[in-house]
């Protein structure tokens, strides 16, 4: 029985998480009383486990800490046992330990390098919370902060010839804004691209495959484009060359041009053979954006004037959607399908403009009618007042 209980080990893999109180240090030393207090909120405690599930009892009520190099195997003793784990949740994965051994961390730990991450560094040791708990270090909004405890520390990274800048770079990216500002937990964080238990940097040739997990259409268009063979021949990473890796900023339409040192201008000037195509696509996007902005402004004015402009709003949404498609179509590196997408968007924007103009014209018509009616009523009241005055005078 004790052997079975011991198997559960640190279910941080399973329900993945760690106590926020341990976030200051990856694996701090705690007293027995502190550990017991933390353990009251632990997923293992909720499952009926006790200290001896992970610890050998040393003296009295004191427990020996597991050897650092043995922690992954200790956790894996439960988390690779499918028949044991399914009693807690039949859908839980049981391949975390084998995956860890394929990771950069796991390969180093098997060589005796103890400065790399083990289970308790990310999930904690006591007070482990569910991965669905927003307080957990491995909850999506906290993952980058957890990774940064090591990967933003030059003292930890320098011995491995690794930069300590990726966490800061990611924090300024569109992905970080989506995750941290809009609380979009589907937005990518460290583990989305690098993996969690099998964490490793994607190889150059695999970067596009990672990005394609979310950016499906962009990847498909690029693979069919003339740039694909060129990038392969130069061993250039597909997505990273233009978008970077961690510090991915929001793309701008101005990238489709020859100004500055980003986008097309990073490699080309306007003397290239396809310059006219690039300029044409850029004009199509600029015209579409201008039409969308004008329609949005006029529809807003009509709406504030009390007009119902549902059709115009629907057309404006369609125009905005087509602009998104047109921007994605840049990855085809050809005049089409961007021009078609932009043309469809422009048509919708023009419908929105027409609806807005009709509504504004109706507003003016009503105002003129109101003005005429007001003048008529005012004239009537003045005439009536004069008539009453004459009657009062006996005239």
Feature-to-residue mapping (PLM):
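Short sequence/structural segments immediately N-terminal
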Residues: 22-383, 391-394
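Bacterial N-terminal signal peptides that target proteins for export
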Residues: 1-14
